[in-house]
Amino acid sequence: MKKWLPVVMACLLSACSSSGSDSKTYYQLPLPQAGVQSTASQGSRLLWVEQVSIPDYLAGNGVVYQTSDVQYVIANNNLWASPLDQQLRTTLVANLSNQLPGWVVASQPLGSDQDTLNVNVSGFHGRYDGTVVVSGEWLLNHQGQLIKHPFHIEVKQQQDGYDAMVKVLAQAWSQEAASIAQSINRLP
């Protein structure tokens, strides 16, 4: 029995010491509060958010952090709970639905007489100076007319850490959704 005691103690100690270093944290972009329910009726305008695309460096599971002007780190333990492009599309549809009264906004095709929005996100990360970056461009097909608009948003984090970074990234993405909604509201 005494021979096994050191082996059992060593196993217990190694199990305790390794469990904390491999802990993973998963992040989901928060959805905005639900606004007015949209129902299709005569005269409703339809918007299909067809795609939100992201580059390869953002397409993995890890949250991305820029450590210098040319270097990026993809986190191993701070991960997206679901694919980032899906989260961006879901939150964009929710934000636009809230900000476009009289419109039905969906992530599925709505019919032949719909506007179509595609967004290409080129940056969605934290940066070494405490700023988050959300950048890219969107393309709207409005009644056969193509409208293309670049965006670049930088917002300073007020707190350190991945939790704060993800919250500020969501805030910046919501800010861009508001800008898209303003552009759509100005359409004839």
Model-derived segments and spans:
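C-terminal motif of bacterial Sec signal peptides marking the signal peptidase cleavage site
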Residues: L12-A15
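C-terminal/domain-edge helix-coil "capping" segments
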Residues: S17, S21-T25, A34-V36, Q159-P188
